[in-house]
């Protein structure tokens, strides 16, 4: 059996009461104090996530921008230095290799932050499709990454840095930022639906920054709450809302797919065809009317006919209702449409509802 991978924060987990699980080959905390309490901490105060398992891939060289334009669906030329952009990497079929964030450090240097379980696959795909004078390097082992999320994130982080955090706009970042005596990159971004920051630092210093932030009275947060938070905010999870068989258009990520950008990109032709023909299925929000929790891969029915599948589901800690995302036949995606979810050989009533399920007050 392959030994599970560990983040640089791993030695500290036990000290804070972490219960760990195998997550895509990594030994990561599913919870600390408990999923519900952790979820609430992020929605009302702040919480700290160890996300050092995420992959980082460095792209540098004079042709970096044109290479990424070819590789990714969004418009890379629109990114200013010191800004980040959400992106999708597609196969020729339009299916998804991964979703990721691109950080522009200079005109010739970018860092791509990718899903942990996809790092090796993404890197291989990027090398295979290399164009022009660029180098692509997997630098994942060099970085630790923490996410401080919640309405009080800025106030807390301000105690540990001299950087004017209020000047960092959403998806903006600052390099060489001192946090608790460690040189970091601070990005105003996250995966929770709340305000917050993702902080990158050398792996060896990750534990120091982790403990310095927790010492400010912040709760450590595990993967369980990370999932309920991102689901309420309707943020896609690769392997569930996106996959090699699910295109970004089907997943409702049109804002990150620039079919009109001049540059050709991998999957562009297939996605244009899909858009012109009209989507056969799309991602919608569902809320259960009867008791039961929708889970990944549960079937969705209408009048005994299977019309789709649940991609993600949970009991929403914020709303107190049982919610899910489902990829279903476009003909049945009107708001208010009643459907049924197959849960343990029973069909449980649900309805299609607006998304996101949760949106923070600005």
Curated annotation (Swiss-Prot):
Reaction(s) catalysed by this chain's protein: N(6)-[(R)-S(8)-aminomethyldihydrolipoyl]-L-lysyl-[protein] + (6S)-5,6,7,8-tetrahydrofolate = N(6)-[(R)-dihydrolipoyl]-L-lysyl-[protein] + (6R)-5,10-methylene-5,6,7,8-tetrahydrofolate + NH4(+)
SUPFAM superfamilies the record matches: Aminomethyltransferase beta-barrel domain, Folate-binding domain
GO MF annotation terms: aminomethyltransferase activity; transaminase activity
Single GO BP term: glycine decarboxylation via glycine cleavage system
EC number: 2.1.2.10
Enzyme class: transferase
GO cellular component, one term: glycine cleavage complex
Annotated transmembrane regions: none
Pfam hit, one: GCV_T
InterPro entries: GCS_T, GCS_T_bac, GCST_C, GCV_T_N, GcvT/YgfZ/DmdA, GcvT/YgfZ_C, TrmE/GcvT_dom1
Record's subunit section: The glycine cleavage system is composed of four proteins: P, T, L and H.
Biological function: The glycine cleavage system catalyzes the degradation of glycine.
Family: Belongs to the GcvT family.
Protein's name in the database: Aminomethyltransferase
Species of provenance: Listeria monocytogenes serotype 4a (strain HCC23)
